[in-house]
Amino acid sequence: MPRNPKSFRLAARNIFLTYPQCDIPKDEALQMLQTLSWSVVKPTYIRVAREEHSDGFPHLHCLIQLSGKSNIKDARFFDITHPRRSANFHPNIQAAKDTNAVKNYITKDGDYCESGQYKVSGGTKANKDDVYHNAVNAGCVEEALAIIRAGDPKTFIVSYHNVRANIERLFTKAPEPWAPPFQLSSFTNVPDEMSSWADDYFGRSAAARAERPISIIVEGDSRTGKTMWARALGPHNYLSGHLDFNSKVFSNNAEYNVIDDIAPHYLKLKHWKELIGAQRDWQSNCKYGKPVQIKGGIPSIVLCNPGEGSSYISFLNKEENASLRAWTTKNAKFITLEAPLYQSTAQDC
């Protein structure tokens, strides 16, 4: 039996409305809610979301936050009328006990509009699970932190750095896969030895490749196209300037490594033999980083410029590196570029 309108009373700061089978555009519905006959207590935030319901009709869900506790006694207070036809809509009305949960629920389809400044609620202190559930489902890092601050202030203060680090990790987006700006076919001046190396390795299936493939060390002036050529060959790890085996930038599923402008004396101190020698199943030991297990078994394309401190050939020709030179010549081919790898002036890296 319907509730007697005279017995209706809504005393709440946060209100959750659902208008079933309501086809009023969400932005127009928001304006209608803003212009209701509010008394002293007025909306500080409104979010209106459209849901395509299973019954084939759109529903509107609304979250309203007020400047104070309401005292609404008119059951028809939230009724709205379609702006272009004579159709009235009456909502289901509830107090929103957990505004974060309501906010996340009504916008699960992503079709919403809003007005005002949302006030974060962390849920009840007695139920920390709700706090962290709401934080995980927040829209951004700062919103998640605000939820935890409100709902679990002790943990927020005592373990702030850990809490922030964990939240930032959860909200970190995977980097976009690198796309070469130039097609491999645009490199028309590649030395035969480089082309043969690439054809031999990439022309085989993974199962048919050598257990430890040969790497190549390519030395040439800047803007000869060596970086763009190396990066256009296939899925790879790009190590530039220093070694970083963080899982965000280094993948054990890559087909080869590109080692670009990493000083030879630095690589000698780190993982020269592991990377150039295509060694398998080894562990990184880079300073300031946690040890990482590397699958390996893939070749490296080492790119360098001529000159002291940059040239791998000059570095290996030093007397103190004689044994390393002997090892490297068995595990890598050396190529010196005499001209750019392309004919036009488009590629300059």
Swiss-Prot record:
It comes from the Viruses. Keywords: ATP-binding, Covalent protein-DNA linkage, DNA replication, DNA-binding, Endonuclease, Helicase, Host nucleus, Host-virus interaction, Hydrolase, Metal-binding, Multifunctional enzyme, Nuclease, Nucleotide-binding, Nucleotidyltransferase, Transferase. Residues 9-118 form the CRESS-DNA virus Rep endonuclease domain. Residues 154-174 are annotated as: Oligomerization. One of its GO terms (molecular function) is DNA binding. Its cofactor is Mg(2+); Mn(2+). A motif (RCR-2) lies at residues 59-61. Pfam families: Gemini_AL1, Gemini_AL1_M. The keyword RNA-binding does not apply. InterPro entries: CRESS_DNA_REP, Gemini_AL1_CLV, Gemini_AL1_REP, Gemini_AL1_REP_central. The active site is at Y105 (for dna cleavage activity). A motif (RCR-1) lies at residues 16-19. A divalent metal cation binds at E51, H59, H61, D109. GO terms for biological process: DNA replication. Residues 141-151 are annotated as: Binding to RBR1. GO terms for cellular component: host cell nucleus. A motif (RCR-3) lies at residues 105-108. ATP binds at G220, D221, S222, R223, T224, G225, K226, T227. Belongs to the geminiviridae Rep protein family. Essential for the replication of viral ssDNA. The closed circular ssDNA genome is first converted to a superhelical dsDNA. Rep binds a specific region at the genome origin of replication. It introduces an endonucleolytic nick within the conserved sequence 5'-TAATATTAC-3' in the intergenic region of the genome present in all geminiviruses, thereby initiating the rolling circle replication (RCR). Following cleavage, binds covalently to the 5'-phosphate of DNA as a tyrosyl ester. The cleavage gives rise to a free 3'-OH that serves as a primer for the cellular DNA polymerase. There are 3 rolling circle replication (RCR) motifs. RCR-2 is probably involved in metal coordination. RCR-3 is required for phosphodiester bond cleavage for initiation of RCR. Homooligomer. Interacts with the replication enhancer protein (REn). Interacts with host retinoblastoma-related protein 1 (RBR1), and may thereby induce the transcription of host replicative enzymes even if the cell is not dividing anymore. Interacts with host PCNA. Interacts with host SCE1 protein. This is Replication-associated protein. It comes from Cabbage leaf curl virus (isolate Jamaica).
